[in-house]
């Protein structure tokens, strides 16, 4: 005797990915924000990429300007990269001179290479989508709303707005551009003219 069981056409629920859960819960957690949920989700997506793909630390989403406390044109991130992203050309010369002096001061049996150390510094990150059209006016609005360096996460006063690096003389953001396939490309954008690098 043969029996056949009829299988019901049941669709099983698919659990959301950890990234999807991270991005969607973050958008809900920023209450009182005047930004659209897709802007918050984009910022959270970039935050996730920086934290887990590029090993940044101390990442925060900012919805209000640290200077005027008005809403930012769009949510920004701030964080600490594992290595310095940008070294001013004059600072690079000073770091090389310092490393050379330290190398000469070492004993003869020590390693002869130069050890150039540039400490990482907090950076602003501007989350964007690749298909967005940015104008100079739009970038100027962002630069007008931010400080030279992002404030330290635990400081509510303006003492954290001054850069600890004397070579940091212009505002800069890391423009994070996300494509439709979730790849992220990063560009350093300065406010104003910057001395060119010499290789």
Predicted feature residues:
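Nuclease-adjacent, charged terminal/linker segments that flank catalytic cores
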Residues: 1-16, 40, 188, 195-198
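Acidic, polar low-complexity intrinsically disordered regions
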Residues: 12-170, 181
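Helix-rich interaction surfaces within compact, conserved domain-sized segments
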Residues: 157-191, 196-199
């Amino acid at each position: 005797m043969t029996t056949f069981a009829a299988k019901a056409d049941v669709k099983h629920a698919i659990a959301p990915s950890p990234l999807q859960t991270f991005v969607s819960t973050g958008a809900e957690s920023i209450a009182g924000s005047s930004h659209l949920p897709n802007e918050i989700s984009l910022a959270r997506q970039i935050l996730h990429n920086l934290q887990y793909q590029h090993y940044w630390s101390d990442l925060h989403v900012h919805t209000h300007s640290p200077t005027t406390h008005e809403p930012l044109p769009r949510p920004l991130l701030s964080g600490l990269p594992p290595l310095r992203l940008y070294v001013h050309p004059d600072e690079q010369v000073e770091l090389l001179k310092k490393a050379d002096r330290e190398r000469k001061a070492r004993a003869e049996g020590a390693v002869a290479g130069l050890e150039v150390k540039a400490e990482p510094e907090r950076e602003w990150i501007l989350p964007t989508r690749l298909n967005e059209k940015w104008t100079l006016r739009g970038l100027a609005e962002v630069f007008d709303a931010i400080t030279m360096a992002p404030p330290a996460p635990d400081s509510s006063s303006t003492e954290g707005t001054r850069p600890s690096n004397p070579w940091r003389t212009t505002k800069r953001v890391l423009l994070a551009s996300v494509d439709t396939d979730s790849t992220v490309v990063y560009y350093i954008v300065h406010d104003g003219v910057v001395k060119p690098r010499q290789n």
